[in-house]
Regions:
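Active-site entrance/lid segments in N-terminal catalytic domains of soluble metabolic enzymes
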Residues: 1-158, 162-178
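Conserved active-site-proximal phosphate/metal-binding subdomains
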Residues: 164-180, 186-318
Length: 318
């Protein structure tokens, strides 16, 4: 068994909702936590920067009120994603607010920094760092991260190319802390499979785009419902980092999904212009074949829980 920090031990369902750039907002995060999964959002979704404090207040107060009203069914903790890349000139400001409001979980991406980890630890928070290979995993833990988000092939948005079997196996050879697995997980059976191969949690993103609370265009939500894994394109053109995107949105932008040029990774920018790259090019993972309708977050999580229980039961019968 993995050694889990106290904040993760309290989770009754092994799911962390991934932070969705532009799409995640307090409404979605609160709904996710109330449904029993870790809700998360990127700090950079709050624009201007001052809005982040308003959002943190909204989330913490809503979850506190829920826990007071439902002591027998407390909300799951929430997480804030920080882009630890040199182009993010808001990092220090945003981390200071996370410290002020004692955000339970910090998810770091695109760079591991000891000072960011120390800031989270200063108030008892934990840090999960997302990685795409074993080399980056070791660096993250060496710099003080408490756990890892293993971003395997098929994940929506920024994604790696490693098979989840290979990635989890290599990390588990030396690391016994918390691991969340990301990559084409959109039903309860896949959540159980992630645990079976050595992960503690499933890290799910694309399925939450097609929810009523998500801050995504209705066309985007419907495109996810209508699409399958055949409609996913892997490219680094849009942000400088390789990721998975819906082909129809690429065509709509006047580009050929089959012939996209390579981008210069040195020109990655997660500052003020970053939002433009994601506005009309829709990130999405390969697991969307399991998404057949737009529904509430509570309904989605209820489906995942039901499928998870059914998958467990079927294995016991076999």
């Amino acid at each position: 068994m993995s050694k889990l920090p106290a904040v993760l031990q309290q989770l009754k369902f092994p799911v962390i909702a991934s932070p969705l750039f532009i799409i995640s907002n307090p409404k979605l995060v609160i709904a996710q936590c109330k449904a029993g999964v870790v809700g998360s959002m990127p700090a950079l979704n709050a624009r201007p920067a001052e809005q982040l404090e308003e959002w943190l207040i909204e989330i913490t107060e809503a979850l506190a009120a829920h826990n007071l009203a439902h002591p027998d069914k407390p909300a799951a903790p929430f997480a804030i994603n920080q882009i630890v890349h040199k182009s993010n000139d808001r990092l220090e400001h945003d981390m200071a607010l996370c410290v002020k409001y004692k955000v339970p979980i910090i998810i770091t991406s695109l760079g591991a920094r000891e000072d960011v980890n120390a800031a989270a630890h200063s108030y008892g928070g934990i840090v999960l760092h997302d990685i795409i290979n074993n080399k980056f995993a070791k660096k993250a833990i060496e710099k003080g991260a408490d756990g890892l988000v293993a971003v395997a092939a098929g994940a929506g948005g920024h994604a790696g190319v490693k098979s989840p079997f290979a990635l989890i196996q290599e990390i588990r050879e030396w690391f016994d802390g918390p691991i969340a697995l990301s990559g084409a997980i959109a039903n309860g059976g896949a959540i159980l499979a992630a645990q079976a191969m050595g992960a503690d949690f499933a890290y799910i993103g694309s399925a939450f785009i097609a929810t009523q609370e998500a801050r995504a265009a209705e066309e985007y939500k419907q495109a996810i419902v209508d699409a399958s894994s055949d409609d996913i394109v892997y490219s680094n053109l849009f942000t400088g980092v390789h990721g998975n995107y819906l082909a129809p949105s690429i065509r709509k932008a006047g580009l050929d999904p089959e012939n996209l040029p390579e981008s210069d990774a040195s020109k990655m920018n997660f500052g003020g212009d970053a939002k433009k790259a994601w506005k009309d090019i829709w990130g999405c993972g390969q697991g969307i074949g399991a998404i057949d309708k737009v529904q509430s977050t509570a309904e989605l999580v209820a489906r995942l829980k039901r499928e998870y229980a059914e998958a467990k039961a079927s294995l016991l019968v076999a």
